[in-house]
Amino acid sequence: MPAKEKYKLKIAVAMSGGVDSSVAAALLKRQGHRVVGIFLHFWHEAAPPDKGGVGGVENKCCSLKALTDARRVANKIGLPLYVLNFSKIFKKQVVADFLDEYQKGRTPNPCVRCNKLVKLGYLIKQARRLGFAYVASGHYARNIAGRLFKAKDKTKDQSYFLYTLNQAELKHLLFPLGDYTKRQVRQLAKKFKLPVAEKRDSQEICFIPEKSHNEFLRRHLKLRPGLIKTFGGKILGHHQGLPLYTIGQRKGIEIGGTGPYYAAKMNYKKNILYVVNDGNDKRLYGEKLIIKDVNWLSGAAPKLPLNCQAVIRYGHKPVKCQVVKSGGNYLVKFTELERAITPGQSVVFYQGEKVLGGGIIK
């Protein structure tokens, strides 16, 4: 943030009721800023009944408990908390796209899209309209003068999910946890006596109530059972619908006899799932890929060819690559083979700690 505006900024903090956003709000409040908590109400379906036919699984997104926790934290810190209803834009931009991508044979990352179009992008617009100078969140990343960097805690770094941001958005974004480790954040939550200090982190997609998103897909997509084959043409069994599988997947491929088997290719025209029985099979690997919908955080495309590091999915190790133009898209060539290159996932480019940009695998 600008040095001359070091104190008493008007900041809207996205508060989910979790530990990270709660500590982010507490830190800013203790620094003397005028902080207001914003709880975002996203779309969620009615909780599906459990196996006994009674009750259901509580949706992790925008649950009553999450809102209650956010209010308890706001009261403890001493700041007002408001609820903004983003359910329509969330359903249209995130949920509908998530289902459409799976139906078309791609494996999307809804968190990337949500940060750009809803949680941060849309919130910034609304917050600015309401007179806030900045929006803050509990993301683990660092924003230094409009340049995005990895967080101090590399095990929790979330810069991968933020590559779609632009300069106008970064200008109004604060990430108070960027220079803290998760352990330090937990310690601060206890020090500040926040009521969510012991609350567990959520690891799954927020708008899906179950631990596995396949049940969600089964409810919302038209799935066609089909054949599971080897590349030699041998029929091994039947799949329950291609959107339920992703490249490199092992779990959930129900084939009797020898195994294990790994999903290697989906032929949507013929509705066939091709598998291999060796996790190191060359057909699970690739040396290049093409990306679309590319965003460069600086606002301008870099000089090509670009030699940098790429992350092909969240939590994956950075690998050396070269980026060149290929028609209207970009071609990414790796120095070593990469396993399970998955259409629909994001590739994010780095130079050391700095995020350059990224795109979606075609």
Label the predicted regions.
Residues 16, 136-142, 147-362:
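AMP-forming adenylation/ATP pyrophosphatase catalytic core
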Residues 1-163, 183:
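ATP-dependent adenylation/nucleotidyltransferase module used to activate substrates
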